[in-house]
Amino acid sequence: MSRVSQARNLGKYFLLIDNMLVVLGFFVVFPLISIRFVDQMGWAAVMVGIALGLRQFIQQGLGIFGGAIADRFGAKPMIVTGMLMRAAGFATMGIAHEPWLLWFSCFLSGLGGTLFDPPRSALVVKLIRPEQRGRFFSLLMMQDSAGAVIGALLGSWLLQYDFRLVCATGAILFILCALFNAWLLPAWKLSTVRTPVREGMRRVMSDKRFVTYVLTLAGYYMLAVQVMLMLPIMVNDIAGSPAAVKWMYAIEACLSLTLLYPIALWSEKRFRLEHRLMAGLLVMSLSMLPIGMVGNLQQLFTLICAFYIGSVIAEPARETLSASLADARARGSYMGFSRLGLAIGGAIGYIGGGWLFDMGKALAQPELPWMMLGIIGFITFLALGWQFSHKRTPRRMLEPGA
């Protein structure tokens, strides 16, 4: 086995272990934020939505800067620094009793993510061969789902005692992750050339095809982020207990572990990437529309199942397509910019979703936010269809098995 092949194989295992630690640290804390501050402390949902939207926008919106800096200086220093910064954000969140302190903690957490997320994504593109990326992204997403359940279970259990324990656990996990990277991650360069920060950013911004694709995905993310805001609140409202939220993530884990890899393996040889992405988005949009009209957990969990199945179909295709479109001369910059759709869509989804949720309650129209999200999903579906029908993306990137 050549040294390059050996590095790729070892890199896969490193990426899987690193991803599990990050997912556990994140999901111990974030699914419980809306329950802690809306249901337990009585804050308006829009206040928590601002905090979550701020974290999302800082992490993903500034990702191009984090990626460009990583292109210049390498992945390791950015990843370690970012993970320590997120640990500090979680520690601050544990003592948040005013909105401004929650917002500050989410700002720190998002800034940390800006530093570590793009280089971690670029490492996947660097280490995994193009023909294997779809399946590897599926493995990462299966891991995400399992980690989400374990993290949510642990966080829900700790929340019975003290929210500070929840935040401390998340902080400790990110400190461990920083140490793991500092110890084992080689000083790899992300790009094929040592790209200056400004040049990497310029290269991305001049790629109109990639920019259009990324911005179109903002609507997709407005739906996707509700697993952190409105869906946990809805489950808690109907069940009357925050403990029920863990079952929402258990559903996601079961569906992901049983369906994600087989669907990706079966569909990658039969359907183009954009068709898989659009099909998943359509299922997600349809499942959103009736959520505000359900009256029991069985109906709600059925719709959540449909939503997750749509995500299982769409996510591997979305990640693979984003990676395929990245220029090897500026991988960090491309993977950083690819998060801008999540920054915009996530911020609008959190803040707008929280505002619509409060408005729906005030007007006695609980279906309002869900109907709006479904409509946004359909508009995004049509926009993606228009984009791909005009062949703005090279055919070789989209063919099955590409």
Curated annotation (Swiss-Prot):
Q: Where in the cell is it found?
A: Cell inner membrane
Cytoplasmic side residue ranges read 1-12, 117-138, 186-213, 265-276, 321-339, 389-402
**Chain ranges passing through the membrane:** 13-33, 99-116, 139-159, 165-185, 214-234, 244-264, 277-297, 300-320, 340-360, 368-388
GO cellular component entries: plasma membrane
- Taken from the record's topology, the Periplasmic segments are 34-98, 160-164, 235-243, 298-299, 361-367
Keywords on this record? Answer: Cell inner membrane, Cell membrane, Membrane, Transmembrane, Transmembrane helix, Transport
The Swiss-Prot or TrEMBL record annotates one GO molecular function as: transmembrane transporter activity
Keyword Transmembrane helix in the entry? The reply is yes
Membrane topology is: Multi-pass membrane protein
What the record says about family reads:
Belongs to the major facilitator superfamily. DHA1 family. MdtH (TC 2.A.1.2.21) subfamily.
Entry protein name: Multidrug resistance protein MdtH
Source organism? Salmonella gallinarum (strain 287/91 / NCTC 13346)
